[in-house]
Structures are given as C-alpha cells and as structure tokens.
Regions:
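Switch II (G3) loop of P-loop NTPases
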Residues: 1
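Alpha-helix C-terminal capping/helix-to-coil transition sites in glycosyltransferase folds
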Residues: 4-5
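Conserved GTP-binding G-domain of TRAFAC-class P-loop NTPases and closely related GTPase folds
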Residues: 8-12, 17-25, 29-173
C-alpha cells in the first residue's frame, strides 16, 4: 500500500556494480580472431544484465501496484539516483547524470521513459561521501566531517550541489 500511495519512488543504482554485457559483446567482436584460435574460451555469463534485471523489477512493482501501462504514469514520480557518482569512470564535468544513464543502461532508460510522463522522471548523480575512501583520504574525511563532503548533480546539470535532499524536494515539489 505504501508503494501505491507514494508521491514518488527513489531508486538507487550503483552503475559500477551493475553487470552490463554490451562491453563483453564489444570485446568479443574486437577479439574474435583470437577467440577463434582458442576454442576453450567461453563468454562469461555470471549474472543477468542490469537492463533486464531492473526492467523485470519495475514490471513486477508496476503489476503489484496495478499501474496500467496503457497510458504513461504521472504518479508516483520516479527519481533514479546514480549512487557513487564520483566513481563512474565516464562521468566528466560536461556530462549529465541523464547522459550517463542513457549510455550505461539504454534499455532501462527506454523502458522508464516509455512508461512515465516526461516530467515525472528524473536522473540524479549522487556522491554521498564526495570521494572514494582509501587510507590517505579517510583521515581527511573524518577531520572535515561527512556532512560537508557529499554532493548531488541534478538532471540536465553539471554542477555539484551540497543539498542531498534535492530529489526529495523534486518529488514533493
């Protein structure tokens, strides 16, 4: 019932931990001559592609909530939060979270945008710690306090914002 009556859903996705087979297909195409010579190599299939896994999860949730897909969803709003955004290798100061999401999970992106109204879905980039913690940065992190280090990037923006509640404000705004 909480899902059905919610104003919005926030879904956190850590892109670096998601299995995406497009890269493996590219590797197979690039290395096909070497693979032909060594028939003992097989493609790894150690998990379901993230696009498929997330789409299936959304389909289950939409079914449980009895949200019909004959028309686009206006409620609940959907905020996709790309967590550990500072660790995403292809994020730059000129790319937006939306662009990263479209590139990394294209099938899921199409599924969500075909089911939600355009202004009822948003993609955010979140770094709750502001950096990856290692031996050197850990002490600096503790000295400066965690409350001063995180940031979020709003959809279609490049600038970091210290207000981590921005997606919640968007959902209720």
């Amino acid at each position: 019932e909480s899902l059905i009556n919610a104003n919005g859903w926030m879904v956190f996705i850590r892109l670096n931990d998601e299995t995406k087979y497009k890269h493996k297909i590219e590797d197979l195409l690039t290395n096909r001559d070497a693979i032909k010579k060594d028939n003992s190599k097989q493609a790894e299939t150690d998990g379901v592609d993230a696009n498929i896994w997330w789409i299936e999860l959304f389909q289950i949730v939409l079914h449980v909530c009895n949200l019909k897909r004959s028309q686009r969803i206006s409620k609940p709003k959907l905020a996709i939060i790309l967590s550990c955004y500072d660790q995403i290798s292809n994020s730059t100061s000129t790319t937006t979270p939306k662009e990263i999401f479209e590139k990394e999970l294209p099938l899921l992106n199409q599924f969500l945008h075909s089911n939600w109204e355009k202004d009822k879905i948003s993609i955010w980039g979140l770094s709750s710690l502001g950096r990856a913690l290692d031996g050197r940065s850990q002490n600096n992190f503790v000295d400066n306090g965690p409350e001063n280090q995180g940031w979020i990037i709003a959809p279609d923006h490049h600038e970091k914002n210290a207000d981590l509640t921005s997606p919640i404000v968007w959902i209720y705004g």
